[in-house]
Amino acid sequence: MKNTVRLIVLISLIPFFDLSLKALGVYGGLGVNPVETIIHATGIWGLRILIVTLLLTPLVYYSDIAFFRHFPKPIGLVAFFYTLMHFLSYALIDQSGDIKIIIVDIIQTPYLIVGWAGFLCLLFVGVASQKRLQPWFNKNRSTISGIVYTSAILAVWHYFWQAKTVEIEAGIYIATISILLLWRLRITTAKK
């Protein structure tokens, strides 16, 4: 089972390896605005993998396949990794690590406030998922799940807002997260 989990984590890191190779000039490139490409790619893959993580709960519940129960935490941590890379790309590359500029930019730009809030939610879950906190994590699983859903909603809102135009891709993410949230609510009410 551990090898399967490792394989899935490696597969989910392929976009990051691809982006890294392009950044190093091994093949292709990052286009006319490489910083924007890196920020966008890490953010979008963080959102996609977060959605996959959320998809696992209804999959386990409705299919009753225990095999999938091992994947939410490692895949969720990969989503956090991409989100962290998204923030660090913005903070260290785009803003040159200047804390004052970053704070002013976040305060003055509404979609950055929303993105920052989503990042903080995932940061909390990432820290809480450490082995030492496992008993607390397991006891508060439903709260953690709510925080992850909040992060997903904030992430898709951040993406939609920063796009400044209506994009089909953003609509797909909104619809997917809405359906997953409804499934989750149905599962939660069915258990009570």
Which residue ranges define each predicted feature?
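Membrane-embedded alpha-helical bundles that constitute the cytochrome b-like, heme-associated redox core
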Residues: 1-192
